[in-house]
Amino acid sequence: MASRPSAAKKQPAKKAAAPAKGPVKKAAAKKAPAKRAPAKKAAARKPAPQPAPNPTNGVYRLVRALWLGLAHGVGAVFRGIGQGAKNLDPAHRKDGVALLLLGVALIVAAGTWADLKGPVGDLVEILVTGAFGRLDLLVPILLGAIAVRLIRHPEKPEANGRIVIGLSALVIGVLGQVHIACGSPARSEGMQAIRDAGGLIGWGAATPLSYTMTDVLAVPLLVLLTVFGLLVVTATPVNAIPQRLRQLGVRLGVVHAPETDEFTNDDERYDEQWREALPARPRKRAQPAAAEPYDPDAAEQEALSRRRGRPRRSAVPQPEMNRPMDAVDVAAAAAAALDGAVLHGMPPSPLVADLTQGVSTGDRESTTPTPTPVPAARPQPGKLKKDATKAAGGEPAGGAVPDLTKTPLPKERDLPPRAEQLQLSGDITYSLPSLDSLTRGGPGKARSAANDAIVASLTTVFTEFKVDAAVTGFTRGPTVTRYEVELGPAVKVERITALTKNIAYAVASPDVRIISPIPGKSAVGIEIPNTDREMVNLGDVLRLAESAEDDDPMLVAFGKDVEGGYVMHSLAKMPHMLVAGATGSGKSSCINCLITSIMMRATPEDVRMILVDPKRVELTAYEGIPHLITPIITNPKRAAEALQWVVREMDLRYDDLAAYGYRHIDDFNRAVREGKVKPPEGSERELQPYPYLLVIVDELADLMMVAPRDVEDAIVRITQLARAAGIHLVLATQRPSVDVVTGLIKANVPSRLAFATSSLADSRVILDQPGAEKLIGKGDGLFLPMGANKPTRMQGAFVTEEEVATVVQHCKDQMAPVFREDVTVGTKQKKEIDEDIGDDLDLLCQAAELVVSTQFGSTSMLQRKLRVGFAKAGRLMDLMESRSIVGPSEGSKARDVLVKPDELDGVLAVIRGESEG
C-alpha cells in the first residue's frame, strides 16, 4: 500500500513533463548546426582467434615454389631453343624437316611392315591404316621419297606446293578407287571393313560420289583426279604427254632416239626447265602453279613479262640493234677492199682490209680442230623491238606483300649455248665461246635473320628519337640491303637524314647511305651493307634471257643491283664510259668482265679492240686474241699515237657516211649487207661493213702525265664525234683528280661507273655528286649511265683468271690476230725527224704556242707559264730558235717572234713531224 502512492505521484510528473518536449526539441534543432555532438566510435572488433600452425602448410609452399621454379626454368630453356631455331639457317631447317620425315617414315614402316607392338604400333595402326586402308604399306615409301627430294633439291622450294597438291590429288583418287573396288563398305559395317578397303580417305572421297551418282560415274571422276595428280607431280602438261612417253621409251631402250643436233637438245632442256613451277612472286595473285593448264610458250612469255614488268636493271631501255648476225662471207669482200680504189679522192679505210688476211694455213693446221655445228637461228629484229618495247613498262600492280621483302631473286634458267658459227672467210668459221666456260654462282638470299634484326634496330631508333616513320620493306642485294622507310604526315625528310650517325651506331655499320627519296617511290631508302656478302659471277649475268635474246655485240654485263636484278648495258648506247675508283675497289675486275663479255658475244668481224695498259700487268691475259687491232700498248707515248690513229679512222668513216648519206654506222652496214650501197662507176673498191672499234685505256693518269695535251685533244675529239662512227671509248683510272679527268673529258663522257673512292672530292669528280666515298669496296659501285638522273648502286660482276684464260684460249684457237702496223708508227717517224727534241716534244709545242700567240719571246715567261726551270726554258728557246720561230738572243731584251699567229698550225705540224716542210 505504501508503494502505490509513490507510483501515482510519479505518473503526473511524467505527464507534466511531456508537453515540454516539443519546445525543447525545436530549440535543440536550431542549435544543431552550431554544434554537433561527436559520433560515437564503433566498438573495435575482437581479432579472430588464430588457428594453430599446421606443419603441412610449409611443405605445400615449398613444393609449390619448386614446381613454379621448375616450370619457369623449363619455359626459359624452351624459349631459348625456340629463339635459336628462329635464327637457324634456312638450309638447316630444310635438312631438319627432311630428317624428321625420314624418322616418321621409319616408324610408320615398322608399324605397317613389321607389325610393331606397343603404344606406338597401336597409334600407327589407328592413324595410318585407318586413313590409308590397304595402301598403308606405301606410306613409308612416299614419306621417304619426299624426304630424299628435300635433301637433294633444297634450292627448289617453289616446287613443294605443286608436289603437295599433286600427291594429294593422286592419293585421294587412288584410295577412292580402292574403296569402290572393295565393295564400298559403309560405317555401319565397322571400322575394320573400312580399313580393309581404302581407309577413311577413300571412304570420304568415294562415298559422296557413289551416293550422289552411281559408281559408274564415280570411278571415271576418280581416275581423272588420279591422272591430274600424276601430271602435276611430274610437271607434265597434257599436250606434252606424248613427248614425255617418247622420252621415257628412249630411256628404257624401247624407242630409238631421234637424230637431233645439239641445238635441239638444248631447246628440249630449255623447255624442260620452264616446266618447273615459277616461284610465288610478291604483288601477284597467289595460286598453285599446277592449277592451270600449262602452255610452254605462254609460260615463257609470262616469265619474260614478269621480269620486264619492273624497270630494266640497266638505267636505259635497250633498243634493238639493226645489225644482223647471220653468217657473212668476209674473205671475198675484204680481198676486194685491198685494191684501195679511191672514192671521191678519199682512200678506203684500211681497217676493213685486215679481215682478209684471216688465218694462215699454218695457223689453221696448228690450231685445235673444232666441230662444225649448225648455225643457230637468230631472233627477228621485229620481235626484239617488240620485246624492248615491253621492257619499258612500269611496276606491276598487285596486292599487299605479307613480308618486308620487296623484290624476289630473279629466276635463272638454262639457256641454249651461244655457239653461232659466223663465216669469216671462205673456209673458216668462228665459234663463240660457250657459256660453260663461265661458272655458275650460288643461289642468292632474299632474306636473313640479320635483315630482321636491322629492321628492329631502325624501328627502335625512330621510336627513341620520336620520328613518325616505319620500315615498310627492304630489297636485298648481293652487297647491301636497301630498307624502305615511309614517313608519317608532316614529317620532314631531313629528320631521317639527320639520324645518319645514330642509325650507323644502331646497326653497327659505318657505311650507311641514305637516299631521299627512292626514285619512283614515296619512301626514303637506307642502304646498309650485308654481313654476308654474295659473289656475282659473270656467267650468271650472261645466262639471262635478255642477254640471249639481244644480238647487240656491245652488250656488257656489269653486275647486280641493290634490288637483286642484273645490270646489263650496251656500250653502243652509252656511248663512252669513265670507270674510276681507288686501289682494290673492283675497277680491274670490271674491265675484265667488260672485255670477256665482248669476247663471249662478238666475233672479230663485229668488234675490234685497242687495249692500252701502261701498268703492263692488267691486260696481258688478252694478248693474242683475234679482236685486237694492235698488240697491247704499254708505252704511254705510243698510246697517244694510237689515239691519234683512232681520230684518223673516225674521219675516214665519216667520209663514207657523208658520201652515201647515212647518219650512223649501223645504217651504213645494213645497207652494205643488203647491197643498197655501191661504189661509183669505174671504182674497183668493194664496200665492207665497218666493225665496232672499242678503245680501252686502263690507266688514264699515266697517259695524262706523259702527253696531256695530245691525249686530251684526241679523247675530246673521239668522244664528241665517234658515236655515229661506231667507235667507243672506255677510260679507267684510280686517280680521279681534276688534272686527270679534266672538264673537257667529263663533258664528253656521259656514262660513269664509280667504285669506292678515298675522298668526297674524288666522288664529285666522277659523278658530280657525293656517294662514292661511302662505298665499301670489292666491287661495290655506283653506275650512272647516260640519261639517268641518279646513280644505281650495284655489285660488280667477277670473273676468275681461269675463266678468262679459257675464253681467251678458245678465241685464239678460232683465229690468229691480224695487227695493223700504222697504229703506232708515228712515234718511230717522230724519233727519226726530231731526235734533238727528245722527251720535250709536248713542252716545246706548248712553248711555241705560247710564244706565237703572245708574240713575246721571253725565257722568264716560259719559266712562269710552263713551270719549268731556267735551264729547261733556255733549251726550249734554243729549240725554237733552230726552227726559226724566234730570233737570236739580244741580251736582256725579249727575242723577236718570227712566226705570225695564223702560221701556228703549220709550225706545230713541223715540230710534231707531220709535215716535211
From Swiss-Prot:
* GO BP of this protein: cell division; chromosome segregation
Gene3D superfamilies per the record?
A: 3.30.980.40, P-loop containing nucleotide triphosphate hydrolases, Winged helix-like DNA-binding domain superfamily/Winged helix DNA-binding domain
The residues that hold ATP are G584, S585, G586, K587, S588, S589
Intracellular or extracellular location(s): Cell membrane
- For the Cytoplasmic compartment, the record's topological domain ranges are 237-917
Start and end of every FtsK domain?
564-764
Q: What is this protein called?
A: DNA translocase FtsK
Provenance organism = Streptomyces coelicolor (strain ATCC BAA-471 / A3(2) / M145)
Gene this protein is translated from: ftsK
